[in-house]
Design a protein with these regions (language model features):
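Residue-level signal for inorganic ion chemistry
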Residues: 6, 49, 186, 211, ...
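Short, well-ordered beta-strand micro-motif
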Residues: 9-11, 27-29, 117, 124, ...
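Active-site HxH/HxHxD metal-binding segment of metal-dependent hydrolases
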Residues: 21, 40-122
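C-terminal regulatory/interaction regions
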Residues: 214-324
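Histidine-centered divalent metal-coordination motifs
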Residues: 67-73, 131, 186, 249
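Conserved beta-strand hairpin/beta-sheet module of binuclear metal-dependent hydrolase folds
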Residues: 1-56, 136-154
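A structural signal for the main folded, soluble domain(s) of proteins
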Residues: 1, 61-64, 75, 80-91, ...
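Metallo-beta-lactamase
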Residues: 33-35, 40-43, 122-214
């Protein structure tokens, strides 16, 4: 999908509620190519990106950058380095969070105010913490295109870690010059860029007012109880995410001295429960490894069938000759 003369979007369909509509990878530049985000380390992301590169007659990537460390944005970095020769660019405060996903070489770090200079376009790097501690946005001022990762989504609202940081990041973005189009990490493009950012700011203010009203009206509540009142009809699969956003608001209100907190008591897991969880995690990883080996074997078999005569279909193949 062509966004501007400098930007193309590869939108990989998703059916998970936390990734509304699609997970997006962006190609920037008409000469040297920059990718923004990589998708997960599974075949649908690899093949859609490679198919798109082939369609636009590209065989290499110059730089593979990410907006933050979450797996659906950074899972394919090793593959982009190994298969397409990309230099990998990650947030300077996200290297530790990306442990296990970075290639052995060809890694550079990005900080607020840095630029990525391609043959025909300059991309600004903006630190926008809030969704995650290492969140970055990328901005092409001449096109008015802002790549937001999960700081802003194409549909709905995002999850928030530190609400104070997040509000400051939104305010910074809404004040960018020439802002026109938002390219989010998930979902469709947003063409009313400044209005959507202001909607996000207003939404967080509204949620804060709602939380305070719940506490004034009903007395002490847990974050989960507040969440159920604020989001009575939410998809149950999104309840934990909504509870996280409520807790982010409560933490900011506590820090400002506007509410008091009565400490809870965490449940201490029993040794047998911990052991079962570890065993299940080992089993889960083993299943994933077996599935990946199976997929690799299937691919090898598919290619072998292209290279050899179809002896598994024919005991003797038809032959053809001139009828004289």
């Amino acid at each position: 999908m062509q966004v501007t003369p400098h930007v193309r979007a590869v939108q990989v369909p998703e059916d998970e509620p936390m990734r509304p509509g699609s997970t997006n990878i962006y190609l920037v530049g008409s000469g040297q190519t920059l990718t923004i985000d990589s998708g997960e380390a599974i075949d649908k992301f690899r093949w859609m990106l490679r198919g798109y590169l082939a369609a636009v007659e590209r065989s290499e990537i110059g730089v593979a950058a990410v907006t933050h460390h979450h797996y659906d944005h950074s899972g394919n970095l090793k593959d982009l380095r190994a298969a397409l020769g990309a230099e990998v660019a990650v947030p300077d405060n996200g290297v530790g969070l990306l442990r296990g996903r970075l290639p052995a070489d060809g890694v550079q770090t990005l900080h607020d105010g840095a630029t990525i200079d391609l043959d025909d376009v300059r991309v600004q790097v903006l630190a926008t913490p809030g969704h995650s501690v290492d969140s970055l946005c990328y901005y092409i001022e001449e096109d008015g295109v802002l790549f937001t990762g999960d700081t802003l989504l194409g549909v709905g609202t995002t999850t928030v870690g530190n609400l104070g940081d997040y509000r400051r990041s939104l305010q910074r973005l809404v004040e960018l010059p020439n802002l026109q189009v938002l390219c989010p990490g998930h979902g469709p493009l947003v063409h009313d860029a400044r209005e959507r950012l202001q909607t996000y700011i207003d939404h967080r203010n509204m949620r804060e007012d709602q939380i305070l009203r719940v506490l004034r009206r009903g007395g002490p509540r847990t974050s989960w109880e507040i969440m159920l009142q604020l989001y009575p009809d939410i998809d149950k699969r999104l309840r934990a995410a909504a509870d996280g956003n409520v807790r982010a608001h409560l933490e900011q209100l506590r820090g400002e001295g506007r509410i008091r907190v009565t400490p809870g008591r965490k449940r201490k897991p029993r040794a047998d429960v911990v052991a079962r969880r570890k065993a299940k995690e080992r089993e889960r990883r083993a299943v994933i490894r077996r599935a990946r080996r199976f997929e690799a074997a299937q691919r090898r078999e598919l290619w072998r069938r292209q290279e050899e005569p179809p002896t598994d279909t024919w005991t003797r193949q038809p032959t053809y000759a001139i009828d004289e």
